[in-house]
């Protein structure tokens, strides 16, 4: 613990908070162009083919972002909107592509958590096909 004299000579340093999504540059989302769309495998205990895209942002950064949901229509030169949020089992993936915005289509046949995947509401007369039973 410093003495009063030590604090007068040299004040305490403020702890610098490091951003978890630096490419967004204090914006909630950023627009970008896909430079490569591919699949990659997750870290050790998990096994899958995760869909990811390399995106060049308007802020000048080139980042790897995750494409959530089943199936997608993205290809090279697609315009996408990205948000922060990492994927725990994919090293280096700190961003998510927003489904249903710009060139990215929403997930088809999605009934639960639709707003997260840009899915439209189903037919009015159709019964909901969720996994829960009443």
UniProtKB/Swiss-Prot annotation:
GO terms for cellular component: small ribosomal subunit. One of its GO terms (molecular function) is structural constituent of ribosome. InterPro entries: NA-bd_OB-fold, Ribosomal_uS12, Ribosomal_uS12_bac. SUPFAM superfamilies: Nucleic acid-binding proteins (SSF50249). The keyword Membrane does not apply. PROSITE patterns: RIBOSOMAL_S12. Pfam families: Ribosom_S12_S23. With S4 and S5 plays an important role in translational accuracy. Part of the 30S ribosomal subunit. Contacts proteins S8 and S17. May interact with IF1 in the 30S initiation complex. Belongs to the universal ribosomal protein uS12 family. This is Small ribosomal subunit protein uS12.
